[in-house]
């Protein structure tokens, strides 16, 4: 109590601020406002002449006691303030106190920014750092991948370095897959007169094993005069992956070592990190057969890995086994269990686990609280997460960068960008320096929200305070370029980031594979996949899903191959895997394949998602199997999967094929009985379905019912009605509907004007089109690709090729890329009048702009060329050229793209190729076409 009173008496006298002392590096830190809770700052030392030597000794003793008390309670910022207070009273803390604090900050995960800040204050206080402090600082930089800083500190000759210094740098390089670079430090150590020890060699052996270079690892083993248990454990765990465990085990036993629980736990840990969780489980059984019994570390490693691999049942079963066997459950186990339950989506059980650990007299630390905050944020319960952070501060458990980053991630996911940026500033106020992940999350959120300028400013600020660009930032920038369609810039961006020292990780590679597959660059996507494989990056279910999605899209593999390949790699497919494969089968029209995958998914114990159900229902409806589709609906109800708007649309589209209003209304009522609730979206879907068939009277009745039930029609409702009137050629009614909409105070959108422009163009009222286009622009709306497509089609219908091309040029100048259908209209215009040169140029334009031709494009081009070949006025040499071009396009269409020519195109092919010497080629091509056509019709 005396100590606390003395502390409180002098508490008001302390001024804490960030000193302007020269740091050990050239990084300039921003002036951060002081915080009473977390400030680490030091005032200029002042000596009080009135303090007697005896009194000084009392204060020194009290400060030392207070410092140790704070450290024992893990209240590190309190310990830091104590050292600051000592300096204020002219009592310089010795290096042991500084070293203890630096060490604790490092082991508690409060990475390099806080460690380096304490290190700077130590120097400012006039205490020279020793090799221990330097080693901790280097380790903190290695942990976050700032290897260049770590190496520069190693080579700073101001402080004498030792074996531990080199081993720390070697370990950091090996952890980041840079074993070759780490090996070079062995010779440097010898030159410095520092001999490598067993730790040096074991670290390098482990590093080479991790990157798959077992030859170099074995060579290092031969260099060691005496192998220890750790060396054998490293080799054993690495050779397990190569199925050569017998050889490594034999070497270990011959050296006089028996594998113990640590050895097996290390192997299990290595397997789990490599994604081979099931093999880790098998090894758990094997170790028990050898009378080596797992401890809580073994169980915790496996439980954590099973949760991360989404194998929740096995994880919980293993935890139960651990409890039954009487293995004590500590804070780490509780934290892993709680985190895993959050990942499994079991929010209630996760919260119960937290209550259990409190009832078990466990004291939550920053890691436990962070797992709780992260889980709550991912579950969308931000208010509870905010409450937990407040509770942490009340209990003097200071949130770290991971805690705040989790909270910021939660805000960003909810679109609460102002709160995210505000918390980022609060972190700086509390001397918790944001890391690359924190900045990356906010930058990515700003990009997604279209706030590009703010995102770029934040990335500049990040670099200014010394946070290097890293994997998270790279991922945010890559995703931004993907969203805005600037795929070509991605390679340059990656090259630039790698040159700055960013090492691509599994997530980066997965993103790059996804970006290039979606951008249509199959070759680049596969090149990134190959590089990922060569670098020894582990494949998980997410990265494999991206790969098979792209390969299925480009027709490189089948669903069976994808499933088999995944199992061979030891990766268990998840619901997303099955959805990808089923969706691919649906596009190919393989209904049997979809049903096989549906059954296989359920046999694997994977519960279908709503997306899975919609794929199966959609396939059955497309094939006219309504009864079977209803059967799937019944299964959905049993699995407590409720149909959504997509399900509703699938059934309504199918019923509309009969072109009978009673069938559509019957389906509507059926879906309502299965849990679809009436809403504006449901009414709009029903009205749109009726209007597509021109059933505007029925649609108007539905709209009346909609209003009677309290659902106010919106722009979508009126757009559908206008479209229906245009389909039925009721142009005046369509335009009067627009007037009604405006009178009701409902604002038109781009789709409204597109509907009117398309309807008027189809009716041949081109002069009216110009008037509506002007009104659209006067309301500040820019024409989009649909607008231009309608305008070009309208000009084409009246035979105005010049007008069509003028609008096409305007479209390009406006920065829009025409769709395939737009190009088809233009190509058809030129082909119909025999201007194949212009048609050919447009086809080339499609290629340059990344627009893929479809069946209609090829048929138009081939038919046009074949027509010219049969024309009597065309010269023979030009006929030969047209014929060769038609043949090339036909080959590309059938053999490369897998498209089948329509009957009219086949007629013109027959006419053109029926000349002497051409019949054999014609017959071969036509046989192939008919074979493919028959195969496709039989599948459907």
UniProtKB/Swiss-Prot annotation:
Signal peptide: none
PPR repeats: 59-93, 94-129, 130-161, 162-196, 197-231, 241-259, 260-294, 295-329, 330-364, 365-399, 400-434, 435-469, 470-504, 505-539, 540-573, 574-608, 609-643, 644-678, 679-713, 714-748, 749-783, 784-818, 819-853, 854-891
GO cellular component terms given for this protein: mitochondrion
Compartmental location: Mitochondrion
SUPFAM superfamilies documented for this protein: HCP-like
Coiled-coil residue spans: none
Transit peptide: 1-24
Primary location recorded for the protein, binned into one broad class: mitochondrion
PANTHER family: OS03G0856100 PROTEIN, PENTACOTRIPEPTIDE-REPEAT REGION OF PRORP DOMAIN-CONTAINING PROTEIN
Protein name listed in UniProt: Pentatricopeptide repeat-containing protein At5g14770, mitochondrial
Originating species: Arabidopsis thaliana (Mouse-ear cress)
């Amino acid at each position: 109590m005396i100590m606390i009173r003395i502390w409180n008496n002098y508490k008001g006298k302390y001024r804490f601020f960030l000193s302007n002392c020269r740091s050990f590096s050239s990084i300039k830190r921003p002036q951060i406002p002081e915080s009473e809770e977390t400030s680490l700052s030091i005032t200029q030392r002042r000596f009080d002449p009135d303090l007697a030597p005896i009194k000084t000794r009392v204060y020194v003793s009290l400060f030392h006691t207070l410092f140790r008390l704070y450290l024992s309670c893990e209240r590190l910022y309190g310990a830091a303030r104590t050292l600051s207070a000592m300096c204020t009273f002219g009592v310089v803390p010795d290096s042991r106190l500084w070293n203890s604090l630096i060490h604790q900050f490092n082991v508690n995960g409060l990475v390099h920014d806080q460690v380096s800040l304490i290190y700077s204050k130590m120097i400012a206080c006039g205490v020279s750092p020793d090799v221990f402090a330097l080693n901790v600082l280097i380790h903190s930089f290695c942990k976050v991948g700032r290897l260049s800083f770590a190496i520069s500190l190693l080579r700073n000759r101001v402080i004498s370095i030792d074996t531990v210094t080199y081993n720390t740098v070697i370990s950091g390089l090996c952890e980041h897959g840079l074993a070759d670079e780490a090996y070079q430090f062995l010779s440097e150590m010898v030159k410095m007169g520092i001999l490598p020890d067993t730790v040096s060699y074991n670290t390098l052996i482990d590093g080479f094993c991790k990157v798959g270079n077992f030859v170099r690892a074995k060579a290092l083993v031969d260099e060691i005069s005496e192998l220890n248990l750790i060396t054998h454990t490293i080799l054993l765990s690495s050779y397990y992956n190569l199925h050569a465990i017998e050889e490594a085990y034999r070497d270990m036993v011959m050296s006089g070592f028996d594998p113990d629980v640590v050895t097996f736990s290390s192997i299990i840990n290595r397997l789990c990190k490599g994604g081979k969780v099931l093999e880790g489980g098998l090894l758990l059984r094997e170790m028990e057969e050898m009378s080596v019994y797992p401890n809580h570390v073994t169980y915790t490693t496996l439980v954590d890995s099973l949760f991360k691999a989404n194998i929740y049942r096995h994880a919980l079963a293993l935890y139960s086994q651990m409890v039954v066997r009487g293995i004590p459950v500590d804070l780490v186990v509780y934290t892993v269990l709680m985190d895993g339950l959050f990942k499994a989506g079991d929010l209630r059980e996760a919260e119960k686990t937290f209550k259990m650990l409190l009832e078990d007299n466990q004291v939550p630390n920053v890691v436990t609280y962070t797992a709780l905050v992260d889980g709550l944020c991912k579950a969308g319960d931000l208010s509870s997460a905010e409450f937990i952070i407040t509770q942490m501060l009340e209990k003097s458990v200071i949130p770290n960068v991971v805690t705040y980053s989790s909270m910021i991630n939660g805000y960003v996911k909810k679109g609460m960008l102002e709160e995210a940026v505000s918390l980022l500033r609060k972190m700086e106020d509390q001397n918790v320096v944001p890391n690359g992940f924190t900045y990356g999350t906010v930058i990515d959120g700003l990009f997604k929200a279209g706030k590009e300028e703010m995102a770029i400013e934040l990335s500049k600020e990040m670099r200014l305070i010394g946070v290097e660009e890293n994997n998270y930032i790279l991922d945010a920038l890559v995703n931004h370029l993907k969203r805005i369609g600037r795929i070509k810039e991605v390679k340059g961006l990656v090259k630039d980031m790698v040159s700055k020292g960013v090492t691509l990780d599994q997530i980066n590679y997965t993103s790059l594979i996804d970006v290039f597959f979606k951008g249509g660059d199959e070759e680049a996507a596969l090149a990134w996949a190959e590089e990922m494989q060569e670098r020894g990056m582990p494949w998980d279910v997410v990265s494999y899903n991206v790969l098979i999605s792209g390969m299925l899209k480009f027709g490189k593999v089948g669903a069976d191959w994808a499933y088999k390949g995944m199992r061979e790699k030891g990766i268990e497919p998840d619901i997303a895997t099955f959805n990808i494969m089923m969706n691919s089968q649906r596009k190919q029209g393989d209904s049997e394949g979809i049903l096989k995958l549906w059954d296989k998914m359920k046999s694997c114990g994977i519960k279908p998602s709503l997306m899975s159900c919609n794929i199966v229902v959609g396939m059955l409806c497309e094939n006219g199997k309504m009864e079977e589709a209803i059967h799937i609906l019944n299964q959905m109800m049993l699995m407590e999967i409720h149909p959504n708007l997509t399900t509703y649309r699938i059934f309504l589209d199918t019923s509309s094929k009969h072109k009978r209003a009673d069938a559509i209304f019957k389906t509507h009522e059926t879906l309502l009985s299965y849990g679809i609730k009436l809403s504006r979206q449901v009414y709009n879907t029903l009205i749109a379905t009726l209007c597509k068939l021109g059933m505007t009277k029925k649609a108007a009745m539905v709209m009346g019912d909609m209003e009677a039930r309290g659902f106010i029609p919106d722009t979508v409702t009126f757009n559908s009605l206008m479209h229906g009137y245009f389909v039925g050629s009721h142009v005046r009614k369509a335009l009067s509907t627009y007037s009604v909409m405006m009178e009701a105070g409902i604002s038109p959108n781009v789709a409204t004007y597109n509907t009117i422009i398309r309807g008027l163009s189809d009716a041949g009222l081109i002069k009216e089109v110009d008037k509506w286009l002007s009104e659209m622009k006067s309301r500040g709306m820019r024409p989009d690709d649909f607008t231009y497509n309608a305008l070009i089609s309208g000009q084409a219908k009246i035979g105005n090729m010049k007008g069509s091309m003028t609008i096409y040029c305007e479209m390009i100048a406006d920065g829009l890329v025409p769709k395939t259908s737009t190009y088809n209209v233009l190509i058809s215009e030129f082909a119909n009048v025999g201007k194949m040169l212009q048609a050919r140029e447009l086809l080339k334009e499609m290629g340059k702009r990344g627009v893929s031709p479809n069946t209609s494009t090829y048929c138009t081009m081939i038919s046009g060329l074949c027509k010219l070949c049969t024309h009597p006025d065309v010269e023979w040499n030009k006929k030969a050229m047209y014929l060769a071009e038609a043949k090339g396009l036909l080959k590309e269409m059938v053999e490369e793209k897998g498209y089948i020519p329509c009957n009219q195109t086949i007629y013109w092919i027959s006419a053109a190729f029926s000349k002497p010497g051409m019949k054999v080629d014609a017959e071969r091509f036509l046989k192939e076409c008919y074979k493919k056509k028959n195969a496709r019709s039989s599948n459907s």
